[in-house]
Structures are given as structure tokens and as C-alpha cells.
Amino acid sequence: LTRSRGLGDVYKRQTLDWYQEALDAVSPENRLIPKPRWRIEHAQNILPEDQNRYSDMDIIASMQPSHAIGDLHFAHKRLGKDRLDNAYTWRNLIDLDVIVAGGSDAPVEIGDPRIEFKAAVSRTDLDGFYKDYWNLEQSVTREEALFMFTKWASYSVFEEDIVGTIEVGKLADLTIFSKDLMTIPEDEIMSSEVVMTIVGGKVIYER
């Protein structure tokens, strides 16, 4: 598992170039791991011509939705409006069949899964604020948001056989909320409370 961390679009391009060079140097049949699942952390500013490369090389994009709803207040000043279309392109990447692994970046961010889920499906901050330039069409469906933090996240670290979905033979790692996050209105997501948390089949929190 190789993870590279960086925020800028030029960094992403350089990293993709290095990954491509490494992949080209050893044929799949001669690799210790034929499909290595390399991952770029904070894949939040990607040049349009580089987005296809994630798909072509099977590179995993690791993103933290809470960064997007914080950045929306100042990104137009840091990036410039011409580059905002390249920011947090979750929808584009998923449509290209790229695995998008979600996270919180705690303790930089709060680490509340409700915040990450809401940010992914709405791209608005916790007060519902957004700007027209923030490309709401790049939000994801609720099923995709769920996959980002479960199924796709476990795949990104080679743990899909033990966690990431609820099924026989896997560790029972799950949180139960007081409301159905898949169906309630967006403005109710943050009011949903944790009823129970189970880790490895053991109840570690119960309201």
C-alpha cells in the first residue's frame, strides 16, 4: 500500500507521473501485488486532463468531504475562480469508476461521520450555506457517500474481506443512528444521534 499526500494540482500531476513510471517499469505479472491500490490523499484539486489518469491507472482518490465545506468560504480566493471546477470533483471521479475513499482527517477536522456524510451529499456547510461557484453537481448520492466511508474505504487498505460491509464472516464494525441517514431530509442529518457503536462485535457505546 502506497499513499502520497499533497493538496495542489501540480503535486497530483507529479505523483501520477511517478506512479505511471513505476507501474510501467514492472509488468503486472512480475509485481508482488499485481494491482497495488496506490492512493493519493487529499485528492481535492485535480486538473481535468489528470482525472482520467486515476481511472486508467486504478489510483484511489482519498478525500475528506468536511474539507470541502470549510474551503468553500475561501477557495475562490486561494484557487481563483478558473480552477474551482477542479476542486473536490467527487462526481467526476466516481463516474470514471475511480474508487473514492472517504475520511475525516481527524484531528484536523472533528471526525464526526455525520458531518462527512452531509458534506458529501450536499456540498453545503452545516448551516446550509454555499456559493454558486461551488459546483453542487459534484455532490454524490447517499449510497455513494455510504460506500466512500465503508466499502470503498476498506478496499483502499486491502481490508474488504474483514470490514466495510455487514455480512457473515466479517467484523461487526458499525454505528447505529437514531434516524435513517439514507432517507431523511439533508437538514436532519446532523440531528441524528448515535444510538450504538459496535467494534469487532463488541458494543463500546450505547445510549
What are these regions (language model features)?
Residues K12-W38, H42-A43, P48-D187, S192, ...:
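His/Asp/Glu-enriched, well-ordered alpha-helical/loop segment
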